[in-house]
């Protein structure tokens, strides 16, 4: 497992979600619906909705499905009532896990999530028990192999001028960190410069990470996979770093 960056959990999640394409459609539709309900149906006036639509288009969700989800969120079409909550706890190795949930039955979902935690070497905590370990950030990756001849200094100047907080060289890619409100501007600046990106999203990044390896790492990844597969789990965040 050598060579993973401290944000390996994000890459792991993306690869896992790619293998769950059918569930991704449902989860992205829910995100669009809730974003539209909370902030209105105009993506230009609703950054969360704009980001959700962008992710849906990247996943090749048909535009009519996107529009239907927006209309369900604004109340123009009948829809199930989903509540957004966060559940949190610790996994194997003392790794903090934060789950973004959308559910129509909080009691049912809480019981199922608690069962997964306890069955796989973790424990579900109280609200706020691990959320403080994470902070909301814009996160963009720039694969070097997709951008031959890329110049780190030029990218650094570009993203900082657009409002980014940091640029990291992680070997096979650059990682750009932004405040949530600067994310769209930085993303647009990269797109306008024809710089290809891989991951571009607003996420929850850990302030500190916990090293895990061997059997402990396998148990942790198994638990994270089970959370990803749960119908009510929208996002999985964890503060681990894979080491030898």
Swiss-Prot record:
Q: Where on the tree of life does the source sit, at the highest rank?
A: Bacteria
For this UniProt record, the keywords arranged alphabetically read as follows:
Cytoplasm, DNA-binding, Transcription, Transcription regulation
Annotated GO MF terms: DNA binding
Q: Where in the cell is it found?
A: Cytoplasm
| InterPro entries for the chain | Integrase-like_N, TACO1_YebC-like_2nd/3rd_dom, TACO1_YebC_N, Transcrip_reg_TACO1-like, Transcrip_reg_TACO1-like_dom3, YebC-like
Q: May I have one GO cellular component term?
A: cytosol
- Could you tell me the Gene Ontology terms of the biological process aspect for this record? regulation of DNA-templated transcription
State the Pfam families in the record: TACO1_YebC_N, Transcrip_reg
* Entry similarity comment: Belongs to the TACO1 family.
The protein here is known as Probable transcriptional regulatory protein CHY_1525
């Amino acid at each position: 497992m050598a060579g993973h960056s401290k944000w390996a959990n994000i890459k792991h999640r993306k690869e896992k979600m790619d293998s769950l394409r059918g569930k991704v459609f449902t989860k992205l539709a829910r995100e669009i619906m809730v974003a539209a309900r909370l902030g209105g149906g105009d993506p230009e006036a609703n950054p969360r909705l704009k980001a959700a639509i962008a992710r849906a288009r990247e996943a090749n969700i048909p535009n009519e499905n996107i529009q239907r989800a927006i209309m369900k969120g604004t109340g123009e079409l009948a829809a199930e009532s989903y509540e957004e909550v966060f559940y949190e706890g610790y996994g194997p190795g003392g790794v903090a896990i934060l789950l973004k949930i959308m559910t129509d039955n909080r009691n049912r979902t809480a019981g199922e999530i608690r069962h997964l935690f306890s069955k796989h070497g973790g424990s579900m905590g109280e609200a706020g028990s691990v959320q403080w370990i994470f902070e909301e950030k814009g996160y963009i990756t720039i694969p070097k192999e997709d951008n031959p001849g890329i110049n780190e200094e030029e990218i650094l100047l570009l993203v900082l001028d657009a409002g980014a907080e940091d640029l990291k060289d992680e070997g096979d890619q650059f990682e750009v960190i932004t405040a949530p409100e600067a994310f769209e501007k930085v993303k647009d600046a990269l797109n306008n410069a024809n710089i290809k990106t891989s991951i571009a999203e607003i996420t929850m990044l850990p302030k500190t990470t916990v090293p895990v390896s061997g059997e402990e790492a396998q148990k942790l990844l198994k638990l994270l996979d089970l959370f990803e597969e749960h119908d009510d789990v929208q996002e999985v965040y964890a503060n681990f770093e894979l080491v030898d």
